[in-house]
Amino acid sequence: MQCIYFTSVLLVIFAQNGQTDDGGMCMAKETCTETQQEAPTNNLYKAADNKYITLIEEALAAYKPCESSNCSCHLDVLKTDLRPFRSGITQDLIELARSYGTKYQIIGHRMFRQRDCMFPARCSGVEHFIRPNLPKLPDMELIINCRDWPQISRHWNASREPLPVLSFSKTNDYLDIMYPTWGFWEGGPAISLYPTGLGRWDQHRVSVRKAAKVWPWEKKLQQAFFRGSRTSDERDPLVLLSRMRPELVDAQYTKNQAWRSPKDTLHAEPAQEVRLEDHCQYKYLFNFRGVAASFRFKHLFLCKSLVFHVGQEWQEFFYDSLKPWVHYVPVPVGINEWELEHLIQFFREHDQLAQEIANRGYEHIWNHLRMEDVECYWKRLLRRYGKLVKYEVKRDEELVEIF
């Protein structure tokens, strides 16, 4: 996936500034004019503008829209995830993988699970998607990781076979098999507005889309917006820019379970949480990873606002179908306040480009991340995984029957 790299822009900027001995400063004996002071700045804006426009044009030229009406837009991810197991999944591999997640068995179209589930709501969400498939599934065993973090590093001893562990999110450093998160149905981040987690993607699709109609593009505030806890300092530059340029950015930290003092919200009192629907009044919405991939990401597109996605490392099963500069604006980790300011300002000054990207992002998520697409991916995953199981599955008496 493409990503913008500001270093080259900054080099152009420094090179332009370095063409005069005085570094662009007006010396005491000179007659200072408004033109002399503004020309370098205008040139710098032009250089950055041209780079962004080129990136958008190149991305659109290479983009082939997915025309499918089912989950096939995402199936390349499934093929890639299952490729390490093309020679088959053995009982030995399952036993080695057992400590990395919750063990499930499907035998005779019945489902069994180990008694202790670390996160009951997460297990329940996973089981919701598996249950409708039971009548057509072969016998199999699954190790499903419901933790935030993936488990199977690709950097382990090269002679060691990868283990078949299913996780909702990962980076390229991991070989876990991705599944659509439990959070499409229940669970997910729990905050005061959503005490049991975001959950119910089908319902949020309707409610956020309704809010987007209340806030069409021409009525949205020309501000970048973010609310969330300080799970990493990657979010700090946007919050700091908000304090310097509140008319440009409204970004504030909220409390999380670990909050103890204003130090945990970058030396400010924590802000109130904001409903997903209320995000829609802003033109520019920022998404940051949390501990792993962000549950917020998919919801932001439904506002028909321009999504700025910080960092390309973390993935969910549907991320690969979203293309940078086509559906969202990619933002590198480590960007500073100055660079953020200029990036946001570019889209304020190129409103049509911003709206076009926002609309493409909305259409893609609305048409290709429906609840039926999530269910379809689960079905394809389970059936293809089941075909790889190369042993007779025998009932583990330590497991309890779920369905």
Curated annotation (Swiss-Prot):
Enzyme class: transferase
A family per Pfam: Glyco_transf_90
Disulfide bonds: C66-C73, C71-C376, C117-C123, C280-C303
Positions that bind UDP-alpha-D-glucose: R227, G228, S229, R230, T231, R235, V274, R275, L276, A292, A293, S294, F295, R296
One cellular-component annotation, GO: endoplasmic reticulum lumen
Main location: endoplasmic reticulum
InterPro entries (UniProt xref): CAP10, O-Glucosyltr/Glycosyltrsf_90
Keywords: Disulfide bond, Endoplasmic reticulum, Glycoprotein, Glycosyltransferase, Secreted, Signal, Transferase
GO MF terms, alphabetically ordered: UDP-glucosyltransferase activity; UDP-xylosyltransferase activity
Annotated compartments: Endoplasmic reticulum lumen; Secreted
Residues of the site described as Interaction with the consensus sequence C-X-S-X-[PA]-C in peptide substrates: F119, R230, Q257
Positions of the catalytic residues: D148
GO process terms (BP): positive regulation of Notch signaling pathway; protein O-linked glycosylation via serine
Signal peptide: 1-20
Annotated segments matching region Interaction with the consensus sequence C-X-S-X-[PA]-C in peptide substrates: 190-195
Sugar-modified residues: N70, N157
Biological or metabolic pathway of the protein: Protein modification; protein glycosylation
Enzyme Commission identifier(s): 2.4.1.-
Family indicated by similarity: Belongs to the glycosyltransferase 90 family.
Cited function: Protein O-glucosyltransferase. Catalyzes the reaction that attaches glucose through an O-glycosidic linkage to a conserved serine residue found in the consensus sequence C-X-S-X-[PA]-C in epidermal growth factor-like repeats. Regulates Notch signaling by glucosylating Notch in the ER, glucosylation is required for the correct folding and cleavage of Notch.
Protein name as annotated: O-glucosyltransferase rumi homolog
Source species: Culex quinquefasciatus (Southern house mosquito)
